[in-house]
Amino acid sequence: MEQDGGGYVSSNAEEYDAAPSSGLPTPDGPDVWRDTRPTSHSYVDEPHANQPIERQLSYRQPGLNPAAEETYEAAFRLIQLAADAERSGSPLQAIQLYTDAGDVLIKVGKREPDPLLKQGIRQKANEIMKRAEELDEWYYSVQESARKAALPPQLQIQRTQVPRVQEAWQGRKPTLSQAPEFTHMRYTAVSTKDPVKFSDDGFQLRVEEAGKKIRVFITITMYNEEGSELQGTLKGIARNLEFMAEQWGDRAWESVAVAVVSDGRTKASASCLDFLAGLGAFDEEIMTVTSMGVDVQLHLFEATVQLVRDDNFESFYPPIQLIYALKENNAGKLNSHLWFFNAFSEQLLPTYTVLVDVGTIPGPTSIFKLIRSMDRNPQIGGVAGEIAVDHPNYFNPVIAAQHFEYKISNIMDKSLESVLGFISVLPGAFSAYRYEAIRAEKGVGPLPEYFKSLTTSTRDLGPFKGNMYLAEDRILCFELLARRGRNWTMHYVKDAIARTDVPETLVDLIKQRRRWLNGSFFAGLFAISNFSRVWKESGHSLSRKIVLTLQFIYLSVQNVLSWFLLSNLFLTFYYVLTLTLYSKYPALLAIVLGIYLAIVGGIVVFALGNRPEKRTAAFYSFSYVFMGLVMLVVSVISIYGLVADVSVTDPRDDLASCSVSNFELVGGVVTAIGLVFASAFIHGEFSVLLSTLQYYFMLPTFVNILGIYAYSNLHDLSWGTKGLETAGHGAAKVAQGNGNLKEIVAQQKRIEAEKQRAAQEKEDVDNSFRAFRSSLLLFWLVTNAVWMYCMTYFVSSSCYLKFISYVVAVFNVVRFFGSAVFLCFRIARRLGTCGASRSGKSGRNYQAHLPAEWQAHYKRSSNATTETTTTGNGQQTYVGLNISDLSSPAATNYRNMEEVR
């Protein structure tokens, strides 16, 4: 092993003279190599028996055919036994087992026909032999009395350089395919358990070793999504890199890195791994061999790839510096962000970080516009783009209603919040942060609060904070706003659009919204109750603090109204139907209202005792269809009564009525519906017309089914659709002593006692969470029932409907005003930019915020195009960049480093 750049780079096992040459392609040789071996099976999935070491060695009987032992399985088992022996304090056994494993690997390597795998096996054999030598030297250098207290030498970093697996290109090869970082993929078995210690433990990313300054660092988080979804997201990023090259210069891609963090090795889909293997950014067999004997937490693959622009392989997108981080265990999306921020970003120190969910496809300029927004205004700490439904199916009410909801939320809510300076949530599916704004300083800052649910036990968090951290992105936004001594704000970038898939069935929608609703409710309460920090701790100006105070008053009233949304929806139905049906069809009125209340009660029962699945889908489907029809009938009656000027009388004569003028009637309709459409039209979003009917049909479902299910499952802190099961190299291992039977039995008893204690604690926590759920659910239902009772018995229909109309009017007027002001600011900024452009100032002002090496390449012309040409000697260039002219300091440093390797 030879140390290089703070890590350890494995040698080629040249000392084994008997081993044949691998015959691997070199950077100067052919760069097309195809692996025909199946990769669906990994030897790290083979567990060994949970027995003492001495008993497990019984399979190595003298009469056993030696050839039967010379297999991958035998070598892996020996390495696992050696690692167990080392951890249990039996170094002599570990030395012998490591030596035996190395011998087996050498013999297996001689028979391996695949040259790449042969090289990996020989390299692993060398590392295992080295480990045996290190343990042997340590054992005889430490006095016997101090041997138990002394620590053996730390296991060196297991790292492998792998020639890229490339497709047989049909036509031109990638423009930069001969550069060293394109011809080799690097694999590292990361054993660091705490991502914060990633750099301290000697691990270093390849772009960091190359001396590249990463300005934009993008993460794609994924779980078990298909390869086509990852391909779509990467292509969206590649299109943005192409636009960045037009704006910032040919080498803009060198300042951008992409980290794909996959949550769990056994959870990753086969199609996704196949896609990455086709790119040359994943190799399961090399991962299996290299990680033998290592307590792997993360499998790290690093490669620079180019995606093809078309099926003919005639042109390519700019290179992507890709980091594929495959976590060994499934620990959740937040843990993936923990690796991205605390391990990778803390090492690279990027200027901006961009969060993208796999399957979300950024527009061709969306990422660039997010970054440009923060470049132009150094006060902006975070930005959000528009999340749009990808190809909405208007014939599916579930999808169409979400399309309407997403559009109106962006047009009215995010626009208003952007004008005021605080966006309550920057969605993790597509948003960007200035890393300086969220980075921890001495363990304090927005990021530590963002990850608090990972660093604090569920028992210590409690049910309130546990639900609050289901919306950890909302906590991050508030911590960013209220950061001590700083005046960070947030901004909505309207034309930074990213398209994503949404739940297509009601069952999937219920699962998703349970976490959203509970998290947003408790996170909202947290932000409102801690707003004083904005005045006491933040560095915002007095005028900004006053504006933020008004915004938080608005949010407080909004939270109160959302609490009583269940009862107010029923009261609206009750009064409209009573005024229409009571005098002529009292029986029909009683039946409709009775079924409605019975459905609400049934939803509570189903939500408490069942998870949404196929067996409960029939009830939920009937409920949402019935309540949707009631909603449409009430809407038609209201519109008809307004247009036909029909007068109705409240049957309860003893209640004082409120007069409603024609102006108030027209104003109520205009503010309730007209301002929503007006906001959409001035923003150019005419597609909302195609989904309005579906949204109002689904509105009772959003209020009743989703709301009741959310409050009925406050004890559930999971993400709903993704479990947090763990998956390691095999079955859990029984702790082992030094071979003494009594010690092994005693240790096993201690483990069993610890398991029982943990199980009891888990049961206590679960019971306390369920008690909190039941109490809050009961309080919510009782308060809504009391409100319904008071309104129906003490307030006339005209007074109640007039009150609701005014409340809706005030909120919609505020939202419309914010939407219009946001649009005015946007138009003014564009007009100002155009005017400055004609005077030659705009480009210089924007250019001043860019890195020095980019300023010379900045082009003000929006008509710049990307071209791929061929020089006279047949060599390709990308936007004027000749592959033979890789003369930048970072490229030269990187090329020299790879040649030394």
UniProtKB/Swiss-Prot annotation:
Keywords, ordered alphabetically: Cell membrane, Cell wall biogenesis/degradation, Glycoprotein, Glycosyltransferase, Membrane, Transferase, Transmembrane, Transmembrane helix
Gene3D superfamilies for the chain: Phosphotransferase system, lactose/cellobiose-type IIA subunit, Spore Coat Polysaccharide Biosynthesis Protein SpsA, Chain A
Top EC class for this record: transferase
InterPro entries with a match to the protein in the record: Chitin_synth, Chitin_synth_fun, Chitin_synth_N, MIT_dom, MIT_dom_sf, Nucleotide-diphossugar_trans
Induction remark: Expression is very weak at all developmental stages.
Residues carrying sugar: N487, N863, N882
Principal subcellular localization: membrane
UniProt name for this protein: Chitin synthase 2
Signal peptide span: none
Region (Disordered), start-end ranges: 1-52
Superkingdom to which the source organism belongs: Eukaryota
Function field: Polymerizes chitin, a structural polymer of the cell wall and septum, by transferring the sugar moiety of UDP-GlcNAc to the non-reducing end of the growing chitin polymer. Seems not to be involved in mycelial growth, nor in sporangial production, zoospore release and virulence.
Gene null: resulting phenotype: Does not affect mycelial growth rate nor sporangial production, zoospore release and virulence.
Reaction(s) the record says it catalyses: [(1->4)-N-acetyl-beta-D-glucosaminyl](n) + UDP-N-acetyl-alpha-D-glucosamine = [(1->4)-N-acetyl-beta-D-glucosaminyl](n+1) + UDP + H(+)
Gene Ontology terms for molecular function: chitin synthase activity
Gene Ontology annotations for the cellular component aspect, listed alphabetically: plasma membrane
Compartment list: Cell membrane
Membrane protein topology class: Multi-pass membrane protein
EC number(s) per entry: 2.4.1.16
Protein family: Belongs to the chitin synthase family. Class II subfamily.
Start and end residues of each MIT domain: 73-137
Residue intervals passing through the bilayer: 516-535, 560-580, 588-608, 624-644, 663-683, 688-708, 775-795, 803-823
Any one GO biological process: cell wall organization
